[in-house]
């Protein structure tokens, strides 16, 4: 019967296949800026965001719990209670992420809306019907009903993907934050100011044995899986070609942003007075963050 085609194993395989191929978000690169969710930022700005609300020490346990629950759910019979639990877990994880500046650029609130739409009572009933259908307990006489169930199964696949993506995103951000922290300290220590000095500090950093150890553990962090397409936009009546990049994971976007930032001479510096990190795009000789600059005429003192 029709039910035989849509076995649960196929559903699981689809989810796992989509994990590696789904484009999560797109970024448009324009000269020395990038745009994401219709907002523009200077290239390299993600490095500032992960240090601004220090993302190195996000507690991973809640994310680990979500990942385990998502895997369990994928391997057992679907039921309403589990779906409601799953929704609650994702929502609480999104609430934690919303406190970190880096996640605000991804319109994480929208993710919450999507999850709530995926787990309305009506949708949950359809998922349960789909479950009975895959076990051949549920015969379908009308093709419209089949279409409805297949559509519901695609929504459910997406709901699973969100669980997996969100639980791995936090690992990628923590990892990136520690890379940014190490490299920024190296640059400040080397007093790198010009693009050439930056390149030297960067080279030292990449060849550092500690960094090599990090790079060998988990997949090589500089391997980017992204799809690039040209987009034409009009600026003051003139057409310009920019590149739009679709990323299927967070790490590739973050690493790309960090490196492109250095290429453009955009980078973080630690204030000589208050030790806070600030982001530079033009101020080659600026040693103090803008707050401390107000106090530094004529001679800087710690405050």
Q: Model-derived features: where do they sit?
A:
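Cysteine-rich micro-motifs
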Residues: 284-294
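Short helix-coil boundary/hinge micro-motifs
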Residues: 7-279
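Conserved small/polar residues in nucleotide/adenosyl-binding loops
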Residues: 1-9, 295-303
